[in-house]
Amino acid sequence: MPAFPLDEAGRIEIAGAGGSALTRQEMVSRTKEWIYDNFEEATIDEDASSGSLRVSGSFLIAEEEQENLNTVMELMAYAVTVVCDDYRYAYSIDDVGAYVVTLVPFAEEETSGTEYEIVDSVYISLPGDYVVLMDDAYRERARLRGELEKMLAEDVSEYGRSRLRRYEQELQQTADWFTATDDYYRLVKENYMACYDHLTGLAETLRAALGAEE
């Protein structure tokens, strides 16, 4: 498996704690401001007794318009929990996942400020579902490598023209599979790292908002 910033439970999680000169009430107030500044259409789940605030967020990873004018978007989703107490706080960023969403444009007569309708949405938990997908990709890659080695070990000197052509096609198909698999690995890692960088940045902005002390 490529090296991703996962904790022992196999999740992308940035957790931390810090000291502050602020009281719990002041920190809760600043944390709410931070949430509204960093999350679109934020809904806060607040537990006043524990000083806990939780909010979900997402950001766009990729967007592609298809030939049929449908749009496919991939978004990273996550949840942030901040627990405030007098002069100290703790935070975690977890429940990371990806949504693959397909949008279809409305007909003009149906449009009233909204241009697209979501017709399909698939949630991929991270890293759980991605680990399964990548394990499948590794197995496929191993199978293709075995087929390629078998083909290369054969004596092609006695092949007829049609068989050689089929052999070349199989080689090309195998090469295409290798390329697609490698591209997939890079895409998955880029998405993971983009998410990690984004979450790390969020953690730093929260630290600044709360005037955290070293």
Predicted ranges, named:
Residues 1-214:
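Ser/Thr-rich, low-complexity intrinsically disordered terminal regions
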